Amino acid sequence: MLNYDIVVIGGGPAGMAAALKAKECGVDSILILERAETLGGILEQCIHTGFGLHYFGEELSGPEYADRFIQLVNEQGIEYKTDTMALQITEDNIVYACNKTDGLLEIQAKAIILAMGCRERPRGALNIAGTRASGVMSAGTAQKYVNIDGYMPGKKVVILLSLIHI
């Protein structure tokens, strides 16, 4: 069993910021678990600028902003495991996670920080009846196709609804 003072589930901007703040407060044993292949979360697909003015004093794109935080995480010696899915958290702070390299991980934590961000859910996950027509996708999926994967999902776009819940 692995032992850490803090396990952060989620390696996006909030997860990295939480880990860095914990390190700044004197916590040495920190592990970030991220299900994507890299740290950075949603920032990786936000190719527009506007990030970093308050924290770094300059305007950065999402990936540039993420890279700065990843650099700080590395400089501070904060451990992380990418491509790792958190499966379960027990009442006594044991985190079960898995990845291709380590298999099943059992991690004892003194504290756990949940910083998993958000994911758009298809209407099936929201219990909305019906089937989705070919080519209908969420805004986040379209953004990922264009900004990360380099695909053009279509030449004509209709946005029916975009909601942000705060």
Predicted segments with their positions:
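Phosphate-coordination loops involved in phosphoryl transfer and adenosine-cofactor binding
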Residues: 3-5, 27, 83, 92, ...
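Feature captures the FAD/FMN-dependent oxidoreductase FAD-binding
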Residues: 64-119
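Beta1/beta-strand and adjacent pyrophosphate-binding region of the FAD-binding site
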Residues: 2-14, 156-160
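Glycine-rich beta-alpha-beta "Rossmann" dinucleotide-binding loop(s) and their flanking helix/strand
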Residues: 118-139
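Glycine-rich FAD pyrophosphate-binding loop
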Residues: 25-42
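N-terminal glycine-rich dinucleotide-binding loop that anchors FAD/FMN and/or NAD(P) in oxidoreductases
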Residues: 44-81, 134-135, 142
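Aromatic pocket-lining residues of Rossmann-like dinucleotide-binding sites
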Residues: 22
